[in-house]
């Protein structure tokens, strides 16, 4: 296993692709790059340009809450109660913790302080009273994978024929479909026509 091992080189030719990780050369038929925000520097190792937007976001979590917060839906998006405030989104994990964020995927947020976490929890509790009394736990700023034009990147690149790229926001919703399409193209050699507008070479 090569988990959490830095990749220092990627090459591809007509017959194989090679990755250098931890000083070891790994050769395979195809390499799939699905590294989120790190896809840009990884692809650059193979001479492929995949520019991304800077898209920071902040969420908070709570301590475990024993009672279910949402009975009929898995996620709530709630409009702001005050002018100038972003909307709130909320979901509860199986362990009872709540994840709370604000704004849309276009929103840029970098405030991961405790005061901001407390304020965000208080706003969420206005919609879901069961959150009152919970503790807000800040989560460090996260960076969303976001191709420069906002659309997914999926497919082989002419510059590296055995390197398959997959990059998108939101991967949570699109990953199952993208995985199925990628499998068809990698394993079966199919060309999925509706992916034509999302190929990596559009940035070249």
Regions from the PLM with identified roles:
Residues 2-3, 33, 165:
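General beta-strand structural signal in soluble alpha/beta enzymes
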Residues 3-16:
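A conserved short coil-to-beta-strand element within the FAD-binding core of flavoproteins
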Residues 15-18, 72, 162:
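Short, hydrophobic/aromatic-rich segments at coil-to-beta transitions
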Residues 20-22:
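Short strand-coil-strand connectors
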Residues 26-38, 179:
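Short hydrophobic core segments
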Residues 35-159:
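Active-site substrate-recognition segment that forms the wall
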């Amino acid at each position: 296993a090569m988990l959490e091992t830095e990749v220092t080189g990627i090459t591809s030719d007509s017959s194989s692709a090679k990755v250098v990780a931890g000083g070891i050369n790994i050769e395979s038929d195809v390499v799939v790059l699905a590294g989120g925000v790190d896809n840009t520097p990884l692809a650059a190792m193979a001479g492929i340009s995949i520019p991304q937007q800077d898209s920071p976001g902040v969420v908070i979590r709570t301590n475990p809450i024993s009672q279910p917060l949402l009975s009929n839906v898995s996620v709530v998006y709630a409009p702001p109660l005050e002018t100038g405030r972003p909307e709130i989104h909320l979901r509860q994990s199986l362990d009872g913790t709540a994840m709370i964020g604000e704004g849309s995927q276009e929103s840029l947020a970098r405030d991961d302080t405790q005061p901001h976490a407390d304020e965000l929890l208080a706003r969420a509790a206005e919609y879901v009273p069961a959150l009152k009394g919970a503790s807000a736990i800040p989560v460090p700023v996260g960076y969303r994978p976001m191709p420069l034009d906002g659309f997914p990147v999926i497919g082989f690149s002419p510059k590296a024929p055995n390197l398959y790229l997959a990059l998108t926001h939101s991967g949570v919703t699109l990953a199952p479909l993208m995985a199925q399409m990628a499998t068809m193209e990698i394993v079966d050699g199919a060309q999925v026509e509706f992916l034509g507008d999302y190929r990596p070479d559009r940035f070249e």
